[in-house]
Amino acid sequence: MGENHDHEQSIKRNSMIYNENERQLCNSNLKILQNKRALSKNDSSSKQQVQDSKPRRALTDVPVNNNPLSQNKRIVAGSKAAKVRREENIRPIVSAVQKRQIYNDRTAAEQEEEEEEEGEDDDAASIVNKKRRIDAEGVSEIVGWQDLDYVEKDDTAMVAEYSAEIFAFLYRRELETLPSHNYLLDKTSKYYLRPSMRTILVDWLVEVHEKFQCYPETLFLSINLMDRFLAKNKVTMNKLQLLAVTSLFIAAKFEEVNLPKLAEYAYITDGAASKNDIKNAEMFMLTSLEFNIGWPNPLNFLRRISKADDYDPVNRNIGKFILEYAYCCHQFIHLPPSTVSAMAMYIARRMTNRNKNELWNGTLQHYSGGIDPIHDEAFQSLCIDLVKDIASSKTHLDSLILKYKKPRYGSVYFQTFKWCTSEMHSNFQNLFNLK
């Protein structure tokens, strides 16, 4: 009995000790929680003091006059800016319409006031039937052109205020990135290559480019890189395919978002080039070209002229085919991209004949860089040579022709070939005839 009593007393003592420990632990947790709340209050109050002590604008402390998007007007409120940031985090790729909404920092009243001012000055702001000088080298005064950049001045995605400077730079840059000479016509050159060999290469490039589903800009850049390299380097026959695939490999890195894998380039050569061969050739090409890759793509100029053509989809499709065809022909590789683009658009408009009275007006002349097809005999000669080549199929571009026979590209080859053939038979009586 005595042992049982001692055991019960021991259990009671242990229970009391345990309860005391639990009580102390609860008190400790309570103090920790109170301290956290106190710290939180102090932190929030200090932040509020800092915010209250320094008045800030919605986005930055920079004066509104330094914001090029604000145009000395009120900038976006803080809540609206926060909403924009959240939307940008959720959707990093924003459409042009959304961009216009994001950067539109004017109030409704200010917009209405500006529209009223524009309505009063429409006649003064319009450049129609006025004489203006183009900001480009060697371009004479052009009468009666419409400033389409001014029409798009409220579209921030079009950066209309910088368009003249951008294209003035591109016109200079295109001359710096041409092949040093036409190595296909100068038989005395030590870099001379038979035109038929280049035709095989570029036609194969068109086929591979189509299989890889790359951007059109990638094809033009790859041809430019290949021509610039061949104009200053002698390449043996068994290395020409390696050169072509490496040119496409470099161009895709420069232009594409989703790149084909290196193994796919090696596979497409059917054993003519390994992965290591392509990597070594890439370094050799880049060194030879001094890593000077960027160039004014001809599609930039075609889109520019297409703006003056009211973005006609038929003319643009035909223009793209003629542009690709011209770049695959050996006799045009020394021409600036802006000239070839103007040739493509002029022939396309001549084919469709949609506005015969204004085949090439002042606006088209301005947006083509000052080219006047009706009075420029050198330009006319180039267009005739191109039409002849398409009609006679001197340049055997089977892959390119097959590509533009597809409905995906509007099947424009059939219409183009038919028209070019009729022009050649009529001795080009209609090509530059405005009657």
Swiss-Prot record:
Signal peptide positions (record): none
Keyword Cell division assigned: yes
GO biological process, one term: G1/S transition of mitotic cell cycle
Biased composition (Acidic residues): 110-124
Alphabetically ordered keywords of this record: Cell cycle, Cell division, Cyclin
UniProt cross-references to SUPFAM superfamilies, sorted A to Z: Cyclin-like
Sequence similarity: Belongs to the cyclin family. Cyclin AB subfamily.
Record protein name field: S-phase entry cyclin-5
Natural source organism: Saccharomyces cerevisiae (strain ATCC 204508 / S288c) (Baker's yeast)
